[in-house]
């Protein structure tokens, strides 16, 4: 039996004892050392050779990950660790740090209860650190902190132990500020990290050593000793005395919750069903004898096994042959069941509540599906990802014979990675794939060509724009084709606070609201008039429709059709058929024919649509473009070249700081200016640059560029070059 199988054997003896299980994630800014830490933890648990740890990158098992040196998927490893005479099962998920793959982080956070936040001691807390901490805390996932790359402070920055400790204090304070800002109210104090209580560890994942207050008490090795070990090139000796995996996993077991403890407070946040039902009680108590309730957090497409659904089991026991219901997609049968170690699936007979399982047989499942032994179980809350696709490519099969297979592959890819949006046009054969950035789409194309062996042709990258309005417009009369029905809509920009509440999930999507009272209170707290809030009809993207009419006969019967009209407009705006962002539409009046035959879909939908389009024309339509916040570190002598590169791309420098010979720049650059930036900034600075970015929402396209951008989008979509004006919609 191999070491992995042996470990899984041990794991199977532990799984039913939930107090001995920990489901944890590792999150960080890109290149702060997550995957190296993961590998050394796995090596320490005897799952791979210690000599290879940190070099093999067992969780970066994808060929693209190893070639690019970054983590693209969220990989899973189950391992066993002995602590104070007991053996614990630790299910570990390594997540991407690159902003293009942030959707994977969001999904991983649903599966875990605790998280190790890794921060590079030289760079400190970075933008993506804040994003991943916010994602974890939003899912009620408890953090501990590992400050990595301490050897760089000693060897490169030549800091003594006092100077190092000042830097640590700043990093810990920055992390605690984020915890205060984003943690659930009941945990803002309790979840603060501190050195004294052992919730912070320091070390070098690459050199396989760590230190914490509990370890100092045990080994008597202090920060001053660490400086001497590193200066004198004795990190191997240090790694034998202060083993990284022991110190980090001991911290995990001491401070991160077991599934039963975590589910007692997490379930109410991630599932809005009745907690007094059998499945509700079973999930809160993590009962392996209860009904099966699992949330799929990842789909892997395997060339041999097909679709593998990986997810967190919150209740019940899954066995081979179990019939399960999949939310929105009928039934599936468990054909094979496994636990995961990177790319390896180790087959098991059963998986119990509180653990992470890999199942073959749930064909209709996607990331986010609820899987249960109960038909029509209330689904888990949708997972909220903080960014949306900003770049699109048109893709078509080089050989017509490959077209049907390409369509299947694109569907598989959007199942496996829901942050890739696929728009399939079977009539033209041209399909659109939209992703979080250039790298995201590069990796997706690589997989289509190499994993699925389909030759494709693609367009140049296309930026995903949004439309909005600048002021109030309307009421605007929209008439039905038979002229028997008239609707009057007003539109105006939605308050930023309301948009934020929608993006945070406090105001849910759709028109069927379970808890309308709470949503109304949220709207009022964000500055919406109470009477107007009571008229809430529909939320589509970041846009809201309200009905503020009083006592109009037959209106209730046509409301579903008006929702359809509103949804259509919000997905295809009047300027360039792009999605609409941050618009409030108010129905203020309507005149309806008394005979229902004259107010069917073919009459009501065009009338509602034209009313909203016309009001938007009167409200001054504007185009928004996605922007990215770019963080650049360069030596002082290369600063001018870096600034020049940013400004050539319509970028603006927002902040500049200097530490020693290093200059840090913060810039905002439109996504349309970011294509090819990676190679350009490297060549401009002679390769002496470290840079990263995060998506930073949308900004107005400069007025002098708007007409030409709108025209080019419309021509690409086969529309007439000029958008229609209000008179056109009035005459319809």
Swiss-Prot record:
List the Pfam families hit by this protein, alphabetically. EFG_C (PF00679), EFG_III (PF14492), EFG_IV (PF03764), GTP_EFTU (PF00009), GTP_EFTU_D2 (PF03144)
Q: Where does this protein chiefly localize?
A: cytoplasm
* UniProt keyword terms in alphabetical order: Cytoplasm, Elongation factor, GTP-binding, Nucleotide-binding, Protein biosynthesis
- Where are the disulfide bridges? none
Question: Taking every annotated instance into account, which residue ranges of this chain make up the domain tr-type G?
Answer: 19-228
Location(s), subcellular = Cytoplasm
Q: Sites of the modification Diphthamide?
A: 598
Query: What one GO molecular function would you report for this record?
Result: GTPase activity
Q: Where does GTP bind?
A: 28-35, 94-98, 148-151
Residue ranges annotated as transmembrane are none
CDD domains reported in the protein's UniProt record: aeEF2_snRNP_like_IV (cd01681), EF2 (cd01885), EF2_II (cd16268), EF2_snRNP_III (cd16261), Elongation_Factor_C (cd01514)
For this protein, the record's InterPro entries field holds: EFG_II (IPR041095), EFG_III/V (IPR035647), EFG_V-like (IPR000640), EFTu-like_2 (IPR004161), G_TR_CS (IPR031157), P-loop_NTPase (IPR027417), Ribosomal_Su5_D2-typ_SF (IPR020568), Ribsml_uS5_D2-typ_fold_subgr (IPR014721)
Q: Which residues form a coiled coil?
A: none
Organism domain of life:
Archaea
Q: Which GO terms describe its cellular component?
A: cytosol; ribonucleoprotein complex
* Protein family per UniProt: Belongs to the TRAFAC class translation factor GTPase superfamily. Classic translation factor GTPase family. EF-G/EF-2 subfamily.
Query: What HAMAP family does the database record attribute to this sequence?
Result: EF_G_EF_2_A
Q: What is the documented function of this protein?
A: Catalyzes the GTP-dependent ribosomal translocation step during translation elongation. During this step, the ribosome changes from the pre-translocational (PRE) to the post-translocational (POST) state as the newly formed A-site-bound peptidyl-tRNA and P-site-bound deacylated tRNA move to the P and E sites, respectively. Catalyzes the coordinated movement of the two tRNA molecules, the mRNA and conformational changes in the ribosome.
Query: Under what name is this protein listed?
Result: Elongation factor 2
């Amino acid at each position: 039996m191999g070491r992995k199988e042996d470990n899984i054997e041990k794991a199977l003896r532990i799984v039913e004892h939930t107090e001995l299980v920990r489901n944890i994630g590792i999150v960080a800014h890109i290149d702060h050392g997550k995957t190296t830490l993961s590998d050394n933890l796995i090596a320490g648990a005897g799952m791979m050779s210690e000599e290879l740890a940190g070099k093999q990158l067992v969780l970066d098992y994808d060929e693209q990950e190893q070639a690019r040196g970054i983590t693209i998927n969220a990989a899973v490893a189950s391992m066993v660790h002995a602590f104070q005479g007991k053996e614990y099962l630790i299910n570990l998920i390594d997540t991407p740090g690159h902003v293009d793959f942030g959707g994977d982080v969001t999904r991983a956070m649903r599966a875990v209860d605790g998280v190790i936040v890794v921060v590079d001691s030289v760079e400190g807390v970075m933008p993506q650190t804040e994003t991943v901490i916010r994602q974890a805390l939003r899912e009620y996932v408890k953090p501990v902190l590992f400050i990595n790359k301490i050897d760089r402070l000693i060897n490169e920055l030549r800091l003594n132990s006092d100077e190092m400790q000042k830097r640590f204090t700043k990093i810990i304070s920055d992390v605690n500020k984020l915890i205060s800002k984003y943690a659930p109210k009941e945990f803002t104090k309790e979840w603060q990290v501190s050195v004294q209580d052992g919730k912070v560890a320091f070390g070098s994942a690459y050199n396989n050593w760590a230190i914490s207050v509990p370890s100092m008490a045990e080994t008597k090795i202090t920060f001053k000793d660490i400086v001497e070990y590193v200066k004198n090139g004795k990190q191997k000796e240090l790694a034998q005395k202060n083993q990284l995996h022991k110190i980090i996993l001991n911290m995990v077991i001491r401070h991160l919750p077991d599934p039963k403890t975590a589910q007692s407070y997490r379930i109410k946040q991630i599932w809005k069903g009745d907690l007094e039902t059998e499945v509700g009680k079973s999930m809160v108590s993590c009962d392996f004898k209860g009904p099966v309730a699992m949330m799929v957090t990842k789909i892997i497409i395997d060339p041999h096994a097909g679709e593998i659904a990986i997810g967190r089991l919150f209740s019940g026991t899954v066995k081979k042959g179990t019939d399960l219901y999949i939310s929105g997609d009928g039934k599936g049968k468990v054909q094979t069941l496994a636990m995961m170690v990177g790319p390896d699936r180790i087959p098991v007979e059963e998986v119990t509540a509180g653990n992470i399982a890999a199942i073959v047989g749930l064909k209709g499942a996607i990331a986010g599906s609820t899987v249960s032994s109960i038909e029509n179980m209330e689904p888990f809350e949708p997972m909220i990802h903080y960014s949306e696709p900003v770049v699109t490519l048109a893709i078509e099969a080089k050989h017509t014979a490959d077209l049907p297979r390409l369509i299947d592959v694109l569907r598989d890819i959007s199942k496996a990675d829901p942050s890739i949006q696929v728009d399939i046009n079977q009539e033209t054969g041209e399909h659109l794939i939209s992703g979080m950035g250039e790298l995201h789409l590069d990796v997706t194309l690589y997989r289509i060509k190499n994993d699925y062996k389909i030759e494709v042709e693609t367009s140049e990258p296309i930026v995903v724009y949004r439309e909005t309005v600048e002021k109030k417009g309307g009421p605007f009369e929209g008439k039905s084709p038979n002229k028997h029905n008239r609707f009057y809509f007003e539109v105006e920009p939605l308050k930023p606070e309301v948009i934020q509440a929608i993006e945070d999930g406090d105001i849910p999507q759709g028109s069927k609201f379970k808890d309308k009272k709470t949503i109304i209170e949220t709207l009022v707290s964000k500055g919406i008039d109470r009477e107007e809030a009571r008229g809430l009809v529909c939320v589509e993207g970041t846009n809201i429709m309200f009905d503020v009419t009083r006592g109009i006969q037959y209106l209730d019967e046509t409301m579903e059709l008006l929702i359809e009209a509103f949804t259509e407009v919000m997905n295809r705006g009047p300027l360039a058929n792009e999605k609409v962002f941050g618009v409030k539409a108010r129905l203020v009046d309507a005149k309806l024919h008394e005979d229902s035959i004259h107010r069917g879909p073919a009459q009501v939908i065009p009338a509602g649509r034209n009313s909203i389009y016309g009001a938007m024309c009167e409200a001054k339509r504007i185009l928004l473009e996605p922007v990215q916040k770019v963080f650049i570190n360069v030596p002082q002598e290369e600063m001018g070249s870096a600034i020049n590169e940013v400004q050539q791309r319509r970028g603006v420098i927002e902040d500049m700081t200097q530490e020693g010979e290093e200059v840090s720049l913060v810039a905002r650059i439109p996504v349309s200016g970011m294509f090819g930036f990676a190679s350009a900034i490297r060549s401009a600075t002679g390769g002496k640059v470290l840079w990263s970015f995060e998506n930073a929402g949308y900004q107005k396209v400069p007025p002098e560029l708007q007409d030409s951008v709108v025209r080019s989008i419309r021509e690409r979509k086969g529309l007439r070059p000029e958008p229609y004006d209000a008179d056109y919609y009035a005459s319809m």
